[in-house]
Amino acid sequence: MYKRQTVFLPHLEKRPEAAIINTSSIFGLFSVPKQSIYSVGKFGVKAFTESLSLELEMSESNVEAYCVFPGHVGTNIYSSAKFKSFEKDDADAAIFGANADTKEQAGIQFKQNAPSSPKHAAKVILKNIRKKNKRILIGIDAHFYDLMSRLFPKSFLKIIWILPFLRNLFKSKN
């Protein structure tokens, strides 16, 4: 990320206006169990983008830096991820593929159950760039999790971790 941006930045600065858009994740705003390595990378994207944005502003550059925090967007990210194993009762399976017996089924469910589509995400990003909002949340889930993590920083993670299990419990009884 850093190398690409240092290569492209001089070219972007020659334009009347330009934008650098880095994609983090809602897991770049808070962490959950079993996602520590992923969160480290996404928190890093957030920190890098915030620092870059300030540097560009201080140098009076015409380039703006934005950080996107998508929630659950219907993509193939889950089905293309590499897992050591997939267990139906595993927490990741409960979150991403609630009723799946295989990783492939979980990937399909993940995509189908997404509250946001890639097309919707693109529209939200463009709308926020036009408004000069540097921090862009994608999806109602991202807004909800962001708000809840701010309001209830200690209990939020416990609530989030148990929600999929409760949802599965009620689905199986109906």
Kindly label every feature range from the protein language model.
Residues 5, 41:
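Active-site helix of classical SDR
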Residues 25:
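Residue(s) in the substrate-gating loop at a strand-loop-helix junction
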Residues 58-136, 140:
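SDR active-site lid
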Residues 133-166:
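A transmembrane-helix-recognition feature enriched in membrane-embedded lipid enzymes
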